[in-house]
């Protein structure tokens, strides 16, 4: 039975310059681990499309995995001078380094789940990040055009505490479990999907990842099953810390999160060993 581990990194996770404190450092190390252990990286949108079509080889073979990034800060795409920890090699450039390290090249694709609202991103960047304009959407089309990236939805505004004043309808913020009725789901999911398809159309625009990895029964059992065709979303991802299988719930697909589900090269090796059983 095919099993696809989906590994998740956050470009904004830079609290130092070692594996435990920096997702960029962790990704570079993890790519070497993946290669050493004989795993291959497959594009997530293509794997999901094959899975939904009933292709028995949807995972792309044995010992395959997919890579995702969350939030879509510019640390995903651009090398940036972190104010405390120096220049950071972007997540996608780290993938490019891995691809180009061998003369024949190696497959290395990732899907970045982005916060779609520009107003929200600019506000949170200003008051909660570095206030340097490092949460933009100017690179999304370039990422898609590279052939090594997909851009997918991480909701309209992440239902983020710092963006509460920009939200039109009251709800509890800092959690996605509060998105539990149609109007709120339309604001967070349908609006984001429609806008992303306009500004950066690509195979990833049919995928959604829940902010905070949080689902609820309304979204999983009612909203997505009834509205997915209309809003153009084919699958949704949580953070269930197990490999995706053919029997997985289409609206709560699992992912592993760096720093939570593994914290070292040895931890990733153990995770992959368990995932392949």
Which role fits each region the language model picked out?
Residues 18-19, 122-125, 162-164, 218-222, ...:
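A short acidic (Asp/Glu
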Residues 4, 151-164:
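Short, solvent-exposed beta-strand-terminating loops
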Residues 164-179:
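A solvent-exposed, charged loop/short amphipathic helix patch at secondary-structure junctions
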Residues 259-277:
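Low-complexity, Gly/Ser/Thr/Pro-rich intrinsically disordered linker/tail segments
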Residues 11-148, 159, 197-198, 204, ...:
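Active-site beta->alpha N-cap acidic-glycine motif
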Residues 46-48, 155, 176-179, 199-207, ...:
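His/Asp/Glu-enriched short active-site or ligand-binding loop at hydrolase and phosphoryl-transfer sites
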């Amino acid at each position: 039975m095919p099993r696809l581990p989906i590994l998740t990194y956050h470009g904004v996770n830079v609290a130092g310059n070692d594996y435990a404190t920096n997702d960029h450092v962790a990704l570079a190390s993890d790519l070497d681990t993946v290669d050493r252990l004989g795993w291959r990286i497959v594009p997530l949108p293509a794997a999901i499309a094959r899975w939904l079509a009933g292709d028995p080889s949807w995972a792309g073979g044995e010992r395959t995995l997919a890579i995702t990034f969350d939030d879509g800060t510019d640390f995903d795409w651009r090398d940036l001078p972190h104010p405390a920890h120096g220049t950071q090699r972007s997540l996608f450039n780290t993938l490019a380094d891995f691809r180009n390290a061998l003369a024949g090249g190696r497959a290395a694709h990732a899907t970045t789940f982005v916060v779609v609202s520009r107003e929200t991103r600019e506000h949170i960047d200003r008051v909660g990040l570095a206030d340097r304009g490092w949460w933009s959407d100017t690179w999304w089309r370039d990422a898609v055009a590279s052939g090594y990236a997909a851009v997918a939805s991480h909701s309209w505004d992440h239902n983020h505490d710092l963006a509460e004043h920009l939200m039109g309808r009251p709800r509890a913020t800092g959690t996605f479990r509060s998105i539990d009725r149609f109007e709120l789901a339309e604001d967070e999911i349908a609006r984001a999907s429609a806008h992303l398809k306009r500004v950066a159309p690509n195979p990833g625009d049919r995928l959604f990842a829940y902010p905070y990895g949080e689902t609820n029964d309304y979204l999983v059992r009612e909203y997505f099953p009834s509205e997915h065709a209309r809003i153009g979303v084919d699958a949704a991802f949580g953070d269930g810390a197990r490999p995706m299988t053919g029997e997985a719930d289409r609206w709560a697909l699992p992912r592993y999160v760096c720093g939570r589900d593994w914290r070292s090269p040895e931890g990733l090796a153990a995770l992959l060993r368990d995932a392949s059983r």
